[in-house]
Amino acid sequence: PSNSSAASDVYKRQIMDFGGTIFVGVATMVGLHRSGGTHGNIKVTGYSSTFLLESDHTCASWCNKSLSDIVKELTDKAGVQALVNPETKSKLEYECQYEETNFRFIQRLARQYQEWLYYDGQNLVFGKPQAGSTTKLTYGEELSVLDVCSQTLARPIKGSSYHSVNNQTYNGQSPDTAAGQNTLGQAAFDSSLALFTAPAVQRAEPRITNKGELDAYFQRRQQSDSAASSFITGESDCRILTVGSIIDVHTAIHTGIGIHVKNSIGTYIITEITHVAGMGDSYQNYFTALPSSIPTLPCPDVPLPVAHTQQAVVVSNEDPKKLGRVQVKMNWQTGPMQTSWIRVLTPDAGTSDKVATNRGFVFIPEKGDQVMVAFRYDDPNRPFVLGSLFHGMSGTGGGSSNKTKSLTTRSGCTITLDDEKGSVMMKDKEGNSYTADGEGNITISASKSITLCVGENKIMIDSEGNISSNAEKDITESAGANIAQSAENIDCTAGSNYNISSTDFTATGSSSATVSGTTKATIDSSGTTAVAGTIVKLN
């Protein structure tokens, strides 16, 4: 590593050389062993340099980063040399490391995306490497033991994945065709599928955004599951072998007395090797190898993490796609870490034949709100908001006997239900309110005006003391007893006729009374017409 000279010195002390193969590791325990004499031996226990990735279990997250970006960040921080070239090139919307060591997390990424992962003695390899040189091994010469094996590993699989942004459920299944297998591997693959005909139904482990991704996932998953359909094991004294070495394996076939013909049984990549160095120049290795043409390695035997509900704070609700999603920061997310845009659980949500969007209960948490986050499939890469939480500085409860239920928005608009009074009150940010007091009374209060409208007809009351009513056709007033009107001035104007009819009619002016007609004024009675006054003038 180049991060410090001290680290380089440590590595130099940990290099093991088998005469061509270099293994760089980290010594984790040193002891003195003495037995049956006065002399002693130094015992050293250690691991590959990937041990530096064995941090304590931790959490981290990335948004819009590629697999290459994530793995390089982790290996660079740990000072581990790495060759990173995954087949998955696209940026991931959200990826979460959840209570895992850094190495366990990298293993899980290799499992989720079916990427190659191994340590070649000097470098952590993530992604299928470029083909290197080939080493020829012949049984009876470099190879002292050779086992050629095949096994029934292939299984048909199918499944689905849901993408919420476009409300699409994608279905896919494995192609059930072998890839990169030799003759033995192909035969084992076909035999396995003949044994297991019913496909297993599974979900895609990574988040899927389209059907092409789902089809590719099931294809690579089946390739990975069946990668070891054909394999060999062997014992060799060839010192240059390591994990990732390509070997061309030959066997000698006896065709007659003293006649042997050497044939290649194929090229293989070593996936597991044990080196044994004894006293003096003694050396032996034991290895397992798979056909070198396989597209993926077997999945790492690593469990998927199980995410638990946890607390978070909303950092944004300005969803760029206007879908009502939020971004949150969980307690362990530091610095720029936060989730991608995630959905919010609500009591009711959907559409109808009359409502295309937002049918249901739409209440998106505000920035700074404390929320509880859960995870679909318990997958840390699939968070959603389960609900909101009050804390000691934001909640006051429902009052004595829990009598009050209320709904209040950011601006102060409030609906309050009082179970003690049986009342309902609605109030806006200015204090304008509607109150039904539970005793048969309704009060509407406004600081400026109240307007009742039906079509173009309206009644308006304003804060300056005016009440007006307007009707396109008729206004009818009726009372079983009395109607009283009182004002400084009362003006009544009719565009055509103005009729007043009653059993008795009295018009009185305390100072004067005037009845006039521009064209004609008529006073008519079927009985007696009386005109009286101190002075009566008829002109």
Give short role names for the model-derived ranges.
Residues 99-104, 110-291:
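Extended, domain-scale alpha-helical bundle/helix-rich regions
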